[in-house]
Amino acid sequence: MTIKHTQDLAQIRAMVPEMRRVKAIHFIGIGGAGMSGIAEVLLNEGYQISGSDLAANAVTDRLADKGATIFIGHEAHNVAHASVVVVSTAINEQNPEIQAAREKRIPIVRRAEMLAELMRFRHGIAVAGTHGKTTTTALVTQIYSEAGLDPTFVNGGLVKSAGTNARLGSSRILIAEADESDASFLHLQPMVTIVTNIEADHMDTYGGDFENLKQTFIDFLHNLPFYGQAILCIDDPVIRELIPRVSRQVITYGFSEDADVRIENYRQNGQQGQFTVVRKGKANLDITLNIPGRHNALNAAAAIAVATEDDIRDEAILRAMANTQGTGRRFDHLGEFETGNGVAMLVDDYGHHPTEVDVTIKAARNGWAEKRLVMIFQPHRYTRTRDLYDDFANVLEQVDVLIMLDVYAAGEKPIAGADGRSLCRTIRSRGKIDPIFVPDSQTLPSVLANILQDGDLVLTQGAGDVGKVARHLAALELNIGRMQQI
């Protein structure tokens, strides 16, 4: 089912009071997934929304169509009429809009603080973890929508069935992705929290101390009220280690024998996964999940655990799993194309951590074992490439053909030896595959044209602008003749 939306602003106002004296809200970096989602919900709640970003995109265009004022570029006068300014973590203190807001004594809040305000008068369901947050948030949203509960949701990526990454619903339920990258999720005070897994990522935030990261997750779980619920993946060794330190009700899920919500008999058939979910005191569920991979079965089990605790009908759960369209850039099937030399399949995926890349490769192998796997990989951030260098090399050498783009810096300065060329050299020296380094993504189509074979699965992978490369390849329909002309 496509997620439907009904709302009555007067009804919502009765549940969620207006922020006192706040009329106009300005977002610096409004084009990002997390920022735009909050902006869209607040816009639909009746606030005057403005925002700025360095470039227009589909998100800013949609917000403008809905009535937001969008500025391209950051200028001091953009905040002239703001009651409050919301900033993303990507914005530094030298930004002229931040400086102007400080001079005018306009309150400046982080994205998570505004999300916390949205959650304050609602039944909040927060989804945290190193991997799987976006898909799990979408699956929870799909279930509650199938059950007719019309939730508000704010996700870090496109919920395909809704056609947006955020929406204001008419019920008191708010489902939100919680971001640990800057520890700002500590502002949130949900009723239910899912934690999918905990790995070393964004370690600059935590002083390079993994114990600090683990304690921050514990602190986040203790933001739950005493009657709240922690839905935790017991397959994850770090989470299993931390469970005794969680002083809230814990419900576990996973493939493990001791999981409260247990996955059995997983098998994959192309784009679909099929498995049984065993629940304590409830009937088993035979699930058909319309997105591939064991990792997505875990994401589904988390959503099912939450829904089961909320007494949502099994029929709604089963429909949601079978009908989900997934999320944007998560094993996103862009098509199968006649290339001029046979047929090739194109998939785009956002995964940019070695664990995420690994599970994507496994999903591709399990669903399309006969296909040659051609990966176009773009490392994301020099610090991540440096910190997880060997892990990246170990994972990337599993593909059949590797085309490597250079690092998407995301504002970071280059780090010697932590770039695409170095990673290629390391992988090549191991002798399993011979990676191809492409420093300019504009030349990639012509490089791919000389490699493509009948039956290939082409997988674009990464969190930077490689998604645009994927869309360009789809527009070219992987046609060898057209790609050679680029």
Curated annotation (Swiss-Prot):
Q: Does the keyword Phosphoprotein apply?
A: no
> What are the boundaries of the signal sequence?
none
What is the protein's name according to its record?
Answer: UDP-N-acetylmuramate--L-alanine ligase
* EC primary class: ligase
Major subcellular location class: cytoplasm
**What is the organism field in this record?**
Vibrio cholerae serotype O1 (strain ATCC 39315 / El Tor Inaba N16961)
User: What's in the keyword line of the UniProt record?
Assistant: ATP-binding, Cell cycle, Cell division, Cell shape, Cell wall biogenesis/degradation, Cytoplasm, Ligase, Nucleotide-binding, Peptidoglycan synthesis
Record-level GO cellular component terms: cytoplasm
Disulfide cysteine pairs (residue numbers):
none
Annotated GO molecular function terms are: ATP binding; UDP-N-acetylmuramate-L-alanine ligase activity
User: Which residues are involved in binding ATP?
Assistant: G129, T130, H131, G132, K133, T134, T135
EC number(s)?
6.3.2.8
Family affiliation:
Belongs to the MurCDEF family.
Pathway, per record: Cell wall biogenesis; peptidoglycan biosynthesis
Write out the annotated subcellular location: Cytoplasm
Q: What's the catalysed reaction? A: UDP-N-acetyl-alpha-D-muramate + L-alanine + ATP = UDP-N-acetyl-alpha-D-muramoyl-L-alanine + ADP + phosphate + H(+)
Query: Carries keyword ATP-binding?
Result: yes
What is one Gene Ontology biological process annotated in the Swiss-Prot or TrEMBL record? regulation of cell shape
Task performed by this protein: Cell wall formation.
